[in-house]
């Protein structure tokens, strides 16, 4: 069966929710997705599921479904150039790669440049800066965060759209690959 992104190769670099949600969406559209792990497991909230002798956050099981998990290769640039789209998470602790043959989308809390670019983010920060935190109040009027990584998953959807836009622009409008985009989690454009 031919699907929308059949033949498109996507590489996820890092373990953040937004990047994982973006690549999960692209995988559901038919892309072949590989995930390059960072060597550490970020802490997650929510239900855990037993996988062998270990417990794994259910959100990771859901978002990593259908992905090929890779360990650090000896030649990262060759790995990057073997993909059409590379999505780099802000917690990956690497600079956004330069790619000759791929669209690179970086997910960061406040963009890659500017006065807040070095600040850490996360679900609560994304909900607060995006205005979502103001939509639910407790009985005493204080803000209540939405459960389930809602803001980071929404940022993942925007990241996937940025990747598809870059792919379309690179292949059809300019005839070249190698465009770079940034998806700040606070909703601002950088």
Please report, for each region that a protein language model flagged, where it lies by residue:
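N-terminal helix-loop segment corresponding to the beta1-alpha1 unit
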Residues: 1-179, 185-187
């Amino acid at each position: 069966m031919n699907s929308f992104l059949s033949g498109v190769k996507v590489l996820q670099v890092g373990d953040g929710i937004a990047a994982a949600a973006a690549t999960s969406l692209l995988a559901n559209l038919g892309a072949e997705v590989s995930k390059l792990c960072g060597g550490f497991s970020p802490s997650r909230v929510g239900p855990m599921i037993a996988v062998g002798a270990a417990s794994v956050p259910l959100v990771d099981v859901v978002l990593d479904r259908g992905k090929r998990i890779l360990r650090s290769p000896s030649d990262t640039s060759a790995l990057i150039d073997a993909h059409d789209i590379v999505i780099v998470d802000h917690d990956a602790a690497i600079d956004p790669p330069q790619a000759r043959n791929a669209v690179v989308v970086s997910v960061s809390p406040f963009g890659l440049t500017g006065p807040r670019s070095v600040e850490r983010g996360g679900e609560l920060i994304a909900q607060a800066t995006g205005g979502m935190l103001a939509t639910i109040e407790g009985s005493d009027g204080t803000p209540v965060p939405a459960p389930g990584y809602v803001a980071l998953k929404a940022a993942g959807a925007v990241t996937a759209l940025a990747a598809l836009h870059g792919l379309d622009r690179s292949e059809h409008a300019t005839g070249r690959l190698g465009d770079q985009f940034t998806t700040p989690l606070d909703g601002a454009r950088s």
